[in-house]
Amino acid sequence: MTKEINIKNVKIGGKNSIVIQSMTNTKTEDIKSTLQQIQNLYNAGCELVRVSAPTFEAAKALKTITKESPIPVIADIHFDYKLAIESIKNGASKVRINPGNIGNDEKVKEIIKVAKEYNVPIRVGANSGSIPKELETLPKIDALCESALKEVRLLEKFDFENIVISVKSSDVIETIKAYEKISKMTDYPLHIGVTEAGTYEWAIIKSSAALGYLLYKGIGDTIRISIAGDPVKEVLAAKKLLISLNLRKGIQIIACPTCARTTIDVEKWASIIEKRFSKVEKNIKIAVLGCVVNGIGEGKDAEIGIAGVQNGFLLFYKGKIVGTFKKEEIFQVLEDYIIKVEVE
């Protein structure tokens, strides 16, 4: 089990639930746009948000952003240790530093001094694209882990243990092996993710393959599904991944792939129902099936199911037929049965 640490009011590690994280892609200096995006992420279910601080203007903007953000803000720092110090002083609840470019021991020592004063954790974020030169001759997985652990040992040397670690690669297998390796070498909380995972479809596939495996094995305390695009999609995908692994409560939609027997637009209705009940925080499966031929059989693992019939739906509950309903009635009926599941 990993250590428990606090990121402002959010606890990670130990027996705590897996925490969903994302990152803004607005200009941090544009405080209004950044706060709006953070609010959108929060509304989608984000619990920690990372914000890049590449300039002193951006670091100073964190003073307002951290005060008005509904969730803890993590400052992402590269190259200049002074930006980490400025970010902490302006309210960052955590800082991420890259061991491949943050600088020498004395610079790290200065960051630690301020992090201790403000009780702010440091994430040592190693990734495959910025391995220190002295480690480049090692096998990639060994280099990733040693890059992170070398920086961790430096933090520990200065009596700092408020640490989170990540060892991300853009390759699925490398990511899995690196996290498996480092999880056996330390008990610090692990932030897991596939770095530079790509555009939506590739990012979902690669992240699900790597993170799904790691989470199933009990590895990971915070997660990010990195997508080139709207970060809100990262949060929605992460939430669904956790629900699918029974690591978070929520509605799961079971839907058939459709065939010539289909009497309804399954994709349309499944999407509408999913969106309508996305805020329900109960472990409930709803099946949306195109016809009655295999409807009950295919949806028998679902608490509630609907199958298309002429001019409406056949509704079944826990494997038994309830009755037929018109399309305009179905949402109210589903709501009634969701409440029924919650009560029973």
Curated annotation (Swiss-Prot):
Pfam families: GcpE (PF04551). Keywords: 4Fe-4S, Iron, Iron-sulfur, Isoprene biosynthesis, Metal-binding, Oxidoreductase. GO terms for biological process: isopentenyl diphosphate biosynthetic process, methylerythritol 4-phosphate pathway; terpenoid biosynthetic process. Its EC number is 1.17.7.3. [4Fe-4S] cluster binds at C256, C259, C291, E298. Binds 1 [4Fe-4S] cluster. It catalyses: (2E)-4-hydroxy-3-methylbut-2-enyl diphosphate + oxidized [flavodoxin] + H2O + 2 H(+) = 2-C-methyl-D-erythritol 2,4-cyclic diphosphate + reduced [flavodoxin]. One of its GO terms (molecular function) is iron ion binding. InterPro entries: Dihydropteroate_synth-like_sf, IspG_bac, IspG_bac-typ, NO2/SO3_Rdtase_4Fe4S_sf. Converts 2C-methyl-D-erythritol 2,4-cyclodiphosphate (ME-2,4cPP) into 1-hydroxy-2-methyl-2-(E)-butenyl 4-diphosphate. Belongs to the IspG family. This is 4-hydroxy-3-methylbut-2-en-1-yl diphosphate synthase (flavodoxin). The lineage of its organism: Bacteria, Thermotogati, Thermotogota, Thermotogae, Thermotogales.
